[in-house]
Amino acid sequence: MVALSNALSRVFGSVAGYKFPSFIQKSINALYVKIFKIDLSEFEPLENYKSLNALFMRSLKKERPFDKAPNICIAPCDALITECAFLDNDSALQIKGMPYKAHELVGEINPLSPSFFYVNFYLSPKDYHHYHAPCDLEILEARYFAGKLLPVNKPSLHKNKNLFVGNERVALVAKDIQGNKLYFVAVGALNVGKMRFNFDKNIQTNAKARFMQTYSYNPPIKVKKGDNLGNFEMGSTIVLFIQNTAFKDLKEKSVKFGESIGEFHAN
């Protein structure tokens, strides 16, 4: 099953990256936009995308405004927030009734502190697929975990235990503006094996590897809130683990990158 799902994702990636003649590609793009009800008002028109991949990875025409105050945490992506809560004895939920151990997801030996609040952001095929820094960050490590590429939609999350932990993923280990540890996890999915990171082009996902790879940064890579960290090639999931922050009521809310979702407590 693992080999099949990963192979399907590689094949899909090859087909989606193919550039058909312009009149054919425009029809393909139009069909995709219609099926998934994509709003292109913030993006280039569909005839400007030379492949499906180009459409999947579309960039915003204009920067979105967001609160620049350093104590405000913003949504890192366009997504539906499916779960959010404080960790309970190192347990987080991929969906209601389906817990997993947070330290396994991010690659730590010891359980994570209950001071961590986690937020699951589900990016559907219609969403803008880039992900951004939710606050000023210093990136210490990027950890790549080879794994399955199972779908991350709700039916699959209800069916497959430890789906996030078993799927291919990249966990960024960082420090936030207060010096607290923060984890930003990009989870792969069927047809979404490739995840790109702008700060390090050496991070290679869906590359037939079967082992964990760690990319360490000394000095740390500094990024500003709102900076474009990278993108999926289709929809998938971001899981954010953050401390010392008060969040709004987020569960089952659709958010846009740049929206204020929380506020850091004063030290």
Swiss-Prot record:
Q: Catalytic activity, per the record?
A: a 1,2-diacyl-sn-glycero-3-phospho-L-serine + H(+) = a 1,2-diacyl-sn-glycero-3-phosphoethanolamine + CO2
The biological pathway it contributes to is: Phospholipid metabolism; phosphatidylethanolamine biosynthesis; phosphatidylethanolamine from CDP-diacylglycerol: step 2/2
Q: Which UniProt keywords apply?
A: Cell membrane, Decarboxylase, Lipid biosynthesis, Lipid metabolism, Lyase, Membrane, Phospholipid biosynthesis, Phospholipid metabolism, Pyruvate, Zymogen
Description of post-translational modifications: Is synthesized initially as an inactive proenzyme. Formation of the active enzyme involves a self-maturation process in which the active site pyruvoyl group is generated from an internal serine residue via an autocatalytic post-translational modification. Two non-identical subunits are generated from the proenzyme in this reaction, and the pyruvate is formed at the N-terminus of the alpha chain, which is derived from the carboxyl end of the proenzyme.
Leading EC class: lyase
Q: What is its EC number?
A: 4.1.1.65
The protein's required cofactors: pyruvate
Residue(s) at site: Cleavage (non-hydrolytic):
G235, S236
Tell me where it resides: Cell membrane
Textual note on the cofactor: Binds 1 pyruvoyl group covalently per subunit.
Output the InterPro entries linked to this UniProt entry.
PS_Dcarbxylase, PSD-B, PSD_type1_pro
Extract the GO molecular function terms from the UniProt entry.
Answer: phosphatidylserine decarboxylase activity
Tell me which residues this entry annotates as catalytic: D78 (charge relay system), H132 (charge relay system), S236 (charge relay system), S236 (schiff-base intermediate with substrate)
Cited Pfam families: PS_Dcarbxylase
- In the UniProt record, does the keyword Cytoplasm occur? no
Transferase as a keyword of this entry, yes or no, is: no
Tell me, what is an example of a GO biological process annotation in this record? phosphatidylethanolamine biosynthetic process
Query: What cellular component GO annotations does this protein have?
Result: plasma membrane
Please list the residues that carry the modification Pyruvic acid (Ser): S236
Q: Could you say which protein family the record assigns here? A: Belongs to the phosphatidylserine decarboxylase family. PSD-B subfamily. Prokaryotic type I sub-subfamily.
Per UniProt, subunit arrangement is:
Heterodimer of a large membrane-associated beta subunit and a small pyruvoyl-containing alpha subunit.
| Task of the protein | Catalyzes the formation of phosphatidylethanolamine (PtdEtn) from phosphatidylserine (PtdSer).
Q: What is this protein called?
A: Phosphatidylserine decarboxylase proenzyme
**What organism is the protein native to?**
Helicobacter pylori (strain J99 / ATCC 700824) (Campylobacter pylori J99)
Q: Which gene encodes it?
A: psd
